[in-house]
Structure formats: structure tokens, C-alpha cells
């Protein structure tokens, strides 16, 4: 009897222990969003397909948002998986859907109206909303000037929110929204006169303005806006905190500054007149020499559009160009460089292009191994213009100032000092017109961007007759920028 009672007590204790164990197991906290991402090894991100956010070219994936969020995924130790949304509303819908992407990195304004849809990280870029109009029309300077105009903006955008707010004060104001277009389409429609006005953020206007010779910025609407990443609504803030910490570190360690320089640091160098002239020369001059650019680039393993951009900066693709200093030809080679590259006739455009391509590759290869891409390409262009010795002087000046001698963003600040006695007197190679290579590189980067946009990715070596140029505003097929591999 005693043994039976003891057995029953032990069974009760075991059952109680099992119950407590099961209860604790059921009450155990689920892994946080951040822990789940790390366990799965993948960060799923939704974005927009546009030149300021994310795009794919022959070199792979690129874009300001893409590069920034890729670095974030790397700090988490996970792979990045990109999804593209059909429109802005689609971003928020999929973000809040069970099993949807964890983060949106799409150049989104952290507007008041969107706070109800999701949660925003700290800002990583400040922009303003600009009214864009056709240069042939009167410039709008205030909200009153929007009344009676054909206005189209992205559906669900912060620009639509601002127009809705203006409508309260100006009931006569009318506008349309569309989820079937992107920013580039809106700018093209203004450029072609299909609509009178649109509203876009200043960073997208700056990046795209050079492709459309007829668009201008009228006035800013409202206060400055903050671009931020977005996570779904909820109480789990683990991913949000991790993203905030990353963006703060990116601001402190220069990552954001370098990305801004890469994608926005050279966007305003041409101006309206320069952009129009370049578009005209694309159609009238480049076709004569495109085959030579392509063949030379293929021989040396470089992007033909980079070589063509150098040619335009040097001579505007004029084979008989001559400067006061004696440099001649389409690639404006000095006699010394021409001889070294085996060029016997600098006025022969094919020889000039071949010599310029060969020289660029040699300059690129001669740079210190510590300089990595994309900076290495910009350094090579600067050395192509001012010479390797002067470039090395500027690198040493940068190092002396506590800057990074391997970053173009830092060294380009030092190059203009080579024309100032207090600085060049301390260098090995002395005086140089140091401001010139800075402008040289900036211009070539912009020409290269445009060439990348307006040419379809084709197999190198195709016949010139099969090549097609697509000028934004004339044709509808546009490409995004890519960095030139050397």
C-alpha cells in the first residue's frame, strides 16, 4: 500500500514537471525578427527599379540604395535578396504582408502620412520636393502657378501627399496619380510636353536632369524631406534598431559620403547647354567612331563607353582638334605619348583612339595596388590628364592632411593645391593646373553615365550598323549607369 501511494505521488510529480516544462516551452519567446534573419541567413529587401535606387546592368546589380543595403546585410553576416515592387503602394503592401520582405530600401520619404503604414529608420539623405516644368513654359514660382496645369505624379508618393495638402488651400488645383510610371517616365513626359508639370525629389531631379534638355526645376514644395528605410508595423524593433545603428555608423565612417559622391557627386557638371550639345553629338558624331571605340576597348578589356567619354571630353569627337599646347587628335595625345603608344598620325581617328586606349590601360596598371575600384578608375583618369607624378603629389598632400590617399573623394580636394605656391613648393613634381583633372574626371563620369543610359547592352564587336542609340525623350528604352571595369 505504501509503495503504491509513493508511486502515485511520483507520477503526480512527473506529470507536474512535464506540464511545467510544456508550459514554459509554449511561453518561450519567439526569436526576434533580427534573430530570424540571421538564422535564415537572408535579408529580403524590397525596392524600386530606378537609377537612384536599384538597377541591373551588364556588370550586375547597382544603385545607391542597393549598395547601402548590401553593406547592411554584410554587417549582419547574411545574404541580400532583392525584390522589386510594381509601384510605391506595392512596397507597403508587401512589406506588411505575412512572410513578406523584412525591409524596404527604396528612396522613400518618411512623410507624416506614411507613419501609419510602417516604421522608418533614421534618415540617410535629405532632399527637397521640386516642381519640374518644361523650359519653353513660364517658370512656376508658387503653388498658385500649379492651378490649371496638367500635373502627374507617382501614385502613393510623398509628392501626391504634398499636392493633396496644397489642395486644401487651393481647391482649384487638380492633379493625377499613376502607378504605371517611374520618375524617369514623368520627367520624359514633361520634356516631351505630354504633361505640364510633375513633382520629384531633388536627388532624382539632379541625377536625371542632364538626360532631358527641356526640363527645369521651378520651386521647392514644403520643407526638407528625409529619406529612410522602412520596416513593417509591429512591436518587434530588433531589425529597426540594427538598421539605425548601421546607418549611424555609415554616417560616421564615411560610407554614406562615399556613396553620395559616387552616385550624386558629379551630376551637375554639364548644365543645360552642355547636355544639349552632347545629345546632338551623340547622334551626329559618335556613330562615325563607335566601331573604333568598341574594337579598341575589346582589345584592352575596358568599357568602350568610358573610352568614348574620354574622347568627347578631349575633343568633342573631332579628329582634327588641336590645342595651343600642341596636343592633337580625337584623343588629344601629346607627341611624346603618341610616339610611346606607336601612333604615327595623331589626326587619324582610329590611331588616336587606339593610342588613347592603350595609354589609359597603362596608366591604370601603374597605380598603387592599394587603390581599389571604383576609385582606381577615377585616379587613372586624373593621371591620364595631369600625369602620374602630380597625382602622387596630391596623394601625399592628402595623407599629410589626415585624408585617405586611396580615395578619390579625398584626393580631389588636394589636386587644386598644386597650383598654389604654398603647396606645390613642397611637392616633388611642383606646379600643376590641379583643378583641371578634377573637372576632367567629373565631366567624363557624367558623359559615361549618359552613354551607359543611351546604349543598349550589346555584345562587344558587333557591327556599327547594328548599334542603336536611345536618347531619353526621343526613345523609350533607357539604361542605368554602371561603373567601368578596367
UniProtKB/Swiss-Prot annotation:
Membrane topology: Peripheral membrane protein
Keyword field: Cell outer membrane, Cell wall biogenesis/degradation, Lyase, Membrane, Signal
Catalytic activity: Exolytic cleavage of the (1->4)-beta-glycosidic linkage between N-acetylmuramic acid (MurNAc) and N-acetylglucosamine (GlcNAc) residues in peptidoglycan, from either the reducing or the non-reducing ends of the peptidoglycan chains, with concomitant formation of a 1,6-anhydrobond in the MurNAc residue
Location of the protein in the cell: Cell outer membrane
GO molecular function: peptidoglycan lytic transglycosylase activity
Signal peptide boundaries: 1-28
InterPro entries: Lysozyme-like_dom_sf, MltF, Solute-binding_3/MltF_N, Transglyc_AS, Transglycosylase_SLT_dom_1
Region entry Non-LT domain, spans: 29-267
Superkingdom assignment: Bacteria
Example of a GO cellular component annotation carried by this entry: cell outer membrane
Pfam families per UniProt: SBP_bac_3 (PF00497), SLT (PF01464)
LT domain, as annotated region: 268-486
Chief place of localization: membrane
Any one biological process term the GO annotation gives: cell wall organization
Enzyme Commission (EC) number: 4.2.2.n1
Gene3D superfamilies, per database record: 1.10.530.10, Periplasmic binding protein-like II (3.40.190.10)
Active site per the UniProt annotation: 314
Disulfide bond sites: none
Function: Murein-degrading enzyme that degrades murein glycan strands and insoluble, high-molecular weight murein sacculi, with the concomitant formation of a 1,6-anhydromuramoyl product. Lytic transglycosylases (LTs) play an integral role in the metabolism of the peptidoglycan (PG) sacculus. Their lytic action creates space within the PG sacculus to allow for its expansion as well as for the insertion of various structures such as secretion systems and flagella.
Family in the record: In the N-terminal section; belongs to the bacterial solute-binding protein 3 family. In the C-terminal section; belongs to the transglycosylase Slt family.
Domain statement: The N-terminal domain does not have lytic activity and probably modulates enzymatic activity. The C-terminal domain is the catalytic active domain.
Protein name: Membrane-bound lytic murein transglycosylase F
Protein species of origin: Stutzerimonas stutzeri (strain A1501) (Pseudomonas stutzeri)
